[in-house]
Amino acid sequence: MFYSIVAIFVGAGLGALLRWFLSLALNAFFPAVPLGTLASNLIGGYVIGVAAVVFTVRVGLPPEWRLFVITGFLGGLTTFSTYSVEVMTHALEGEFGWALAVAALHLTGSFALTALGMWTARAWLAVA
């Protein structure tokens, strides 16, 4: 359990630092679309795709490596990567209805909860 905690902790720290560095390096180029965040999400999507296959095929790898990469590093870098692999897994298995449903659920759910959170905070803080 200790090694699992350390793997997640170190991975998350490194992922968060990379996301921050990408934001510092890229966000000023096109402020309307934070390119650092976009880069973080695209990198995360690619890395989780690789990791999903590697950890499925290389079953002998210690579980701490999966925790380090997926839960820690990608969790710190982005939350978009897990969503991406879940949708693409459905699509690659020919489950296009499920892929669309999962994508729609994540997207609409995220927007709805973001709006709800903004509304709640504005109400608490009495902001117009």
Swiss-Prot record:
User: Its function?
Assistant: Fluoride-specific ion channel. Important for reducing fluoride concentration in the cell, thus reducing its toxicity.
* Entry keyword set: Cell inner membrane, Cell membrane, Ion channel, Ion transport, Membrane, Metal-binding, Sodium, Transmembrane, Transmembrane helix, Transport
Which coarse location class applies to the principal site listed for this UniProt protein?
Answer: membrane
How is this protein's activity controlled?
Answer: Na(+) is not transported, but it plays an essential structural role and its presence is essential for fluoride channel function.
Question: Which reaction equations make up its catalytic activity?
Answer: fluoride(in) = fluoride(out)
Localization recorded for this chain is: Cell inner membrane
GO BP of this protein: cellular detoxification of fluoride
Secreted as UniProt keyword: no
Tell me the HAMAP family matching this sequence: FluC
Cellular component, GO, one term: plasma membrane
Give the transmembrane region(s).
Answer: 5-25, 35-55, 67-87, 96-116
State what protein this is by name: Fluoride-specific ion channel FluC
Task: Report the membrane topology from the UniProt record.
Answer: Multi-pass membrane protein
Indicate yes or no for the key word Cell inner membrane.
yes
- Pfam families associated with the record: CRCB (PF02537)
What GO molecular function terms would the record report? fluoride channel activity; metal ion binding
Which cysteine pairs are joined by S-S bonds?
A: none
Highest taxon above the source species? Bacteria
| Protein family membership | Belongs to the fluoride channel Fluc/FEX (TC 1.A.43) family.
